[in-house]
A protein has these predicted regions:
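Glycine-rich N-terminal segment of FAD-binding domains in flavoprotein oxidoreductases
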Residues: 44
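Ubiquitous "structural anchor" signal
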Residues: 22-23, 52-54
Length: 107
C-alpha cells in the first residue's frame, strides 16, 4: 500500500486579498516556496463569490444551487491565482495536486 501523501503547508488565499495590490507578489513568493515545500493553495471566492451572493439573493436561489455557484466562484479565483505565478498549475483533484507539488510547483 502506498503511504499517504504528506503536505508541508496548506495555504488558504482569501478572496479579500484580491482587492489590493498584494496578491501578485504573494503568489510569486508562494511559487518560490513551492520549490522547497510541498504545499497546496486553496482559493477563497473573492469578488466572484461577492457576485454570487448578490445574484443569489436577488434571484432567491435555493441554498444548494447557491452553494454550487460559490464553489465555482472559488474555481474562478483559483484560476486568477494560478495566472499570477509561473510556478503554478491548475488542478481539479487531490491526486493531480500531489503530482504537481512533488514536481516543486504550486497546485
Amino acid at each position: 500500500m502506498t503511504p499517504p501523501f504528506r503536505w508541508d503547508l496548506l495555504l488558504k488565499v482569501g478572496g479579500s486579498l484580491g482587492r489590493g495590490a498584494a496578491l501578485a507578489p504573494l503568489m510569486q513568493r508562494i511559487g518560490l516556496l513551492a520549490g522547497r515545500r510541498r504545499l497546496l493553495v486553496v482559493p477563497g471566492g473573492g469578488v466572484f463569490a461577492d457576485l454570487v451572493r448578490r445574484q443569489t439573493a436577488r434571484a432567491r436561489v435555493d441554498e444548494e444551487t447557491a452553494h454550487h455557484m460559490a464553489l465555482f466562484a472559488m474555481d474562478q479565483f483559483g484560476l486568477l491565482l494560478s495566472s499570477l505565478s509561473r510556478r503554478s498549475t491548475v488542478v481539479d483533484n487531490l491526486q493531480a495536486a500531489e503530482l504537481v507539488a512533488e514536481a516543486g510547483r504550486v497546485p
